[in-house]
């Protein structure tokens, strides 16, 4: 996990000086430029094109094979297993956000699902009325008032921003699995953790594949669409964590989270 984060960060930082788009002089174009918050757009579009090729030649064939040899219940179990593994990260961020009631709920979920749910394969806690929620250090930074910073497109990892990139590193530090690799045989644990990373990424991608296909077919500019949806989703997630209201006066929701489609698995 550490290698994945630092590799992406190194690539981004190494090309920042040459990758920035020039600021438009036209007032209307400048307003659009500032709203998109994407000064690295030329570079980001190149990385996005690379990600699409990786999707076409690697992720999509592997995902379709994974879908062909597994059942919807199996795939859902994989997703809930990994969601349960990341619960300690959510608990830490709830505490940092001073949201102690939610931290207590997540601890209850983790205990119930790790025992009665067979290590999180089954979401027993949700059936008992303890709904899941996910927090990240990117959310915590947003609650603390940190702006998102420029939009970033990371190789293979997809859309992000400066705040979430920093948050990714902190979440890795909060993750107990990170220390399992340090305290045990490093080579063996590294192999196990990389395998788990791959399986988790595959499970999440498979669950969102149909949604992504629809978005690609129905958008005139798939990159701009991806950027817009990511930024809206992240604003909603931070507002949700902070308990703020959106422009309609309603509580912000995870409208754009791919996790909302967990129960829409396909054969």
Tell me what each language-model feature is.
Residues 16-19:
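C-terminal motif of bacterial Sec signal peptides marking the signal peptidase cleavage site
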Residues 22-34, 145-267:
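A structured, mid-to-C-terminal "fold-capping" secondary-structure block
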Residues 28-57, 87:
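Post-signal peptide N-terminal segment of mature Sec-exported envelope proteins
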